[in-house]
Amino acid sequence: MEGGGGGGSLPPFLSKTYEMVDDPSTDAVVGWTPAGTSFVVANQPEFCRDLLPKYFKHNNFSSFVRQLNTYGFRKVDPEQWEFANEDFIKGQRHRLKNIHRRKPIFSHSSHSQGAGPLTDNERKDYEEEIERLKSDNAALSSELQNNTLKKLNMEKRMQALEEKLFVVEDQQRSLISYVREIVKAPGFLSSFVQQQDHHRKKRRLPIPISFHEDANTQENQIMPCDLTNSPAQTFYRESFDKMESSLNSLENFLREASEEFGNDISYDDGVPGPSSTVVLTELHSPGESDPRVSSPPTRMRTSSAGAGDSHSSRDVAESTSCAESPPIPQMHSRVDTRAKVSEIDVNSEPAVTETGPSRDQPAEEPPAVTPGANDGFWQQFLTEQPGSSDAHQEAQSERRDGGNKVDEMKSGDRQHLWWGKRNVEQITEKLGLLTSTEKT
């Protein structure tokens, strides 16, 4: 390494280093400082490539630095490779003989020969340090292994995410192409608008038309439907008004007929007149009384052979004196009528055939009538039950047709009006038959 040649007393490394630094042709790579007390390696790569192989048969800059340290050279500037020695000065080659090679403080031979065995404390310290280094090494190894596993898992997740991303991109492309084809199809826009209009419409359930709807029916409806201005509502309202006017006309007719029958008709035979009043009392319910006409309850007395004009006049006076009495309910009126009709003996011959004078006709003696001429008529009329089967069937059919649309009060009033109409027709027919019989 140090090479041969040069002065016999000088080490070859020192002589070759001095020649290399003192050569002016190598000042660009290595040379003296301006003071001449040190040298600087300016270009380390070229120094290793060109000068070290030429002078020292190697190109290792570290080995060159170690040799300098062996001969007592030191580094002057930490920013650059500048070395100095007290006897290595420019122009003073003769001072190189004062530079000697330093011997190492600890050599393998001297350590093996002169060093004694380690003490227990030193051995213990070394062992503890070794164990600490082993534990640190194990911790670092486990951490490295965990980091390696995490890295592998992260790589797998990244790969899965990339695959999902590719799938989503493919689906998006297919969806866009499909939508583009649908939009390009003819008639798509019109059908789409029709579907939107169809979905905007609200479904309404048909509501049965009823004049009297209770609260439960309105609450159970799913969809409200306003029929205030509909043609069906107008039609049913007109029909209802017509029917109501017809019923009012019929009611007025019945009241007028009751007035005529109660005031103008007198009977020549012994059958008492208030029997017609009994029928008319049943025709008028307590809630339908007219303020113009009062239908007082008639007190019927049993005709006997000893009854005379005093009985008839007394009955008329009692019937007129009861004008302020309250009306009898429908059910009680029917029961009382049947009870009182059963007490009348239609086949009995009255002792006195004269009746009290009416308000419109003067009092005169009626012609004698053969007893029993109208007994069959009056027996059939008086024994007939007010709620006949025909009237009852008609009322039931009327209620079935109405269903739940009309409440119980309206159904009862309608049944009462139909029953009254039928009885008035029967009264009219039988009065006509009576008139023809009397004429004959």
From Swiss-Prot:
Q: Which residues form a coiled coil?
A: 121-181
Q: Which GO terms describe its cellular component?
A: cytoplasm; nucleus
Motif Nuclear localization signal is found at 200-204
Using the UniProt annotation, give all residue ranges assigned to the region (Hydrophobic repeat HR-A/B): 133-183
What Gene Ontology molecular-function terms does this entry list? Answer: DNA-binding transcription factor activity; sequence-specific DNA binding
- Xref: InterPro entries: HSF_DNA-bd, WH-like_DNA-bd_sf, WH_DNA-bd_sf
Role description? Transcriptional regulator that specifically binds DNA of heat shock promoter elements (HSE).
Protein name as annotated: Heat stress transcription factor A-4b
What lineage is on file?
Answer: Eukaryota, Viridiplantae, Streptophyta, Embryophyta, Tracheophyta
